[in-house]
Amino acid sequence: MPEDLGYEKLLEQDGFFAHLLGRSPTGAERDLTYGPDLPVVLLTGGPGMHKGRLLREVRDGFAAKVPVIHLDCASPVFEVRAAAEPGARSAATEALAEVARRLSSWQGTGGSFAFPRLFAGLAVIASGVADGTSAAVAAEVERYGELPQRQRLRGLAAGDFWTGVLHGTVRNLLTALVADGLGQYPAAASTALLDALFDRLAPRGKVELQRIYGAYPGAAGQPRHGLSNLADDFQAGDEAREVAEGFLFRALREDLEAAYASASGWLRRVGRPGLLLDHAESPLGEGLLRAVLTDRRGGQRDRVVIVGTARRPDG
């Protein structure tokens, strides 16, 4: 990017991104720009403006110091993965799961992240698998098995969210689904999944799911209803599916917020986490941006830095 566009200044030790993320490329603390009313940054322009290069430079320069994930929203990989089970996956859910997987193995300051809130939502939409049996649902849920637990200190991982050791919780959840032997009845498999999920929640987990999924449209404060409605909306497709996908994105950001806001997170984590959405003009990117903008306009606050790029053919 030409120097007169400020490319280098944006990335320097005391530049825009250092203050947005709260850390310099060398790891020094920086005062945060903006408060809890965090904006979404969108870089627009025509070809040759090096917007994608800028996002890659942000990733390469900062990702070792703060958890920054780069996502190419125009990549066909998410659509390809979703096509294998279109009733239980979409490009958006595959992208969110990819972000969570990368952060669940992040090895920087504060360690990896757990995503029990996102996991709960992804698990319930797994009931839409084509086969429809409890065994097929369990196999789909197993794809997300690493998300609700941290990769370090497994015995302590999010133990206040689930009862017992979380790794065993996920395994027991799958065992319970298969043992039910419900045949090809997606509704019954979904009910069994919700039963198994809520049976394994610790008190804090119940409070958190009530707070998050109890706020889902039509849930009236009941997390089971919220999760069930989310699964139904996902199955309905079109605008209803977009609502479900947007809520799953909120759940992912809630997991990140919880990791920072907890007592241990306050002591150990630094800066702000970042999500870099290249080619945000694509359907996947537009959906993610619309979801976070809608949430923030409605008063939902989180500390996740969202930076996107959008190509304009007219320059």
Please tell me what each predicted stretch does:
Residues T44-G48, E85-R89, T93, F234-G246, ...:
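Short, charged/polar micro-motifs that form catalytic or ligand-binding hotspots
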Residues K51, R312-G315:
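Elongated scaffolding segments in large macromolecular assemblies
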Residues Y7-L32, L38, V243-P313:
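Conserved Walker B catalytic segment
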Residues R101-F247:
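Coupling/switch/interface segments within P-loop NTPase motor domains and analogous charged loops
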Residues M1-F62, L71-D72, R81-E85, R89:
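Walker A/P-loop-proximal flanking segment of P-loop NTPase domains
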Residues E79-S112, Q222-H225, N229, F249-Y260:
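Conserved NTP-binding/hydrolysis module of P-loop NTPases
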